[in-house]
């Protein structure tokens, strides 16, 4: 076994263990009184465990994408069900932090083709970031705009720093000395989006400030 295979196997094993840990902590949060001294600490532990777990999922997916090994599998997805499953993933953190989570959907029920696991991972990660940096509001919207599915995550925090807005994340970034960010999440999102194609259109991502809530906005377009 070469070192790369060993590292990938180890990351996969750690990811599975973290998934079990987060499930236990989610159950603990539901049973703990909100005013209990351990409630905020359990919430923070859950957030950090989920953040690391998401990073490992992204690393494994990127390894497979770079090696042309990722089993890209676009399927027809009912957006209303997809939205409810994403909300279920983030709800324990939202409730623990007292965040107002808003959801905006097309009035017409719609289905869309995309790789469920890839898109679920990047949207969930974006919501986690919004919950971390918002003041008290986060909005998830899924609307068809210009014949593309537009998934937006908006918050009312301070927004993205100028340096991050100036970077397009075409390649993995080093650690930012000011923010501590590696840019992994945005790089993963961009690569995952670009796998989705329909005729001449390709999936894309961008970040901006302002948006619908005045803070940071993450926007994903899927053709």
Tell where the protein language model's regions lie, with residue ranges:
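Short conserved segment of the HATPase_c
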Residues: 160-173
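Glycine-rich ATP-binding loops of the HATPase_c
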Residues: 194-211
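Conserved micro-motifs of the catalytic ATP-binding
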Residues: 67-72, 111-114
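Conserved catalytic submotifs in the C-terminal HATPase_c
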Residues: 75-76, 100-110
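Short beta-strand/loop element within the Bergerat-fold HATPase_c
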Residues: 137-147
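Acidic ATP/Mg2+-coordinating residue in the GHKL
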Residues: 155
């Amino acid at each position: 076994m070469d070192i790369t295979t060993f590292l990938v196997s180890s990351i996969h094993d750690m990811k599975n263990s973290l998934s079990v840990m987060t499930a236990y902590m989610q159950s603990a949060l539901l049973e703990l009184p909100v005013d209990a001294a351990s409630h905020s600490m359990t919430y923070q532990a859950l957030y950090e465990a989920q953040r690391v777990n998401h990073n490992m999922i992204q690393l494994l997916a990127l390894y497979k994408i770079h090696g042309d090994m990722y089993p890209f599998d676009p399927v027809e997805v009912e957006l209303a069900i997809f939205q409810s499953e994403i909300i279920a993933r983030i709800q324990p953190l939202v409730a623990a932090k007292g965040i107002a989570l808003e959801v905006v959907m097309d009035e017409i029920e719609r289905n869309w083709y995309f790789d469920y696991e890839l898109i679920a991972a990047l949207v969930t990660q974006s919501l986690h970031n919004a919950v971390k940096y918002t003041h008290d509001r986060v909005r998830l919207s899924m609307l068809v705009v210009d014949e593309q599915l537009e998934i937006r995550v908006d918050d009312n925090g301070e927004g993205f720093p100028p340096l991050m807005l100036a970077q397009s994340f075409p390649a993995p970034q080093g650690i930012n000395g000011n923010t501590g960010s590696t840019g992994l999440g945005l790089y993963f999102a961009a690569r995952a989006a670009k796998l989705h194609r329909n005729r001449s259109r390709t999936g894309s991502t961008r970040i901006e400030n302002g948006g619908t809530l005045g803070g940071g906005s993450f926007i994903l377009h899927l053709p």
